[in-house]
């Protein structure tokens, strides 16, 4: 089991087929524990960074990027600020600085992944864009997306976990609620054309069903979970109100009838 100070995935984009590189093993692991955290990192060397990169502060000085390749710093800052802006619109907050590390490789006990959020150190780790395409599982829904869009989705997903965790003020939020918010933001923020491509790759019949927003469904069908989550968010009069309720501890999908 991972140390308590690491949040178990919801934040990890590895939990998505196509993001996660050994999905069968992941699925069994996922169903055998309750997620209390947002990312699991191996105790030894959680990431590989080349060539002594420098931490660059974004225009939003609460965000900074560490990258061995400077050309991706501006892109990472742009996507992080864009995601933060949307999350703030939904009532979340960022009281603490967040660092984003662009790395060649991220490892944990169940395999390699493309992105994680470490809530202890407030660090998001994302694979460098140039490494993403080769890391995707064959047939992944993400393989139809341009690399830049995948990178945007990864950054948005982890920013959602980070701001939800910071906004909860220590409230112990359920795994499924964390993953709901991250899935919603990942799909909500990318261009509608690419959002629809992901939805078409894992369609869920309308109307959206709150009973499908569960850790069990996420374990077996993460992309259908994400489709249903975004459709549920989009169908509500004020989808952001649900996110505010989750952050305040006033709502959980674990309490909804199945």
Regions found by a protein language model. Name each.
Residues 133-154, 173:
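Short pre-active-site segment immediately N-terminal to the catalytic Zn-binding motif
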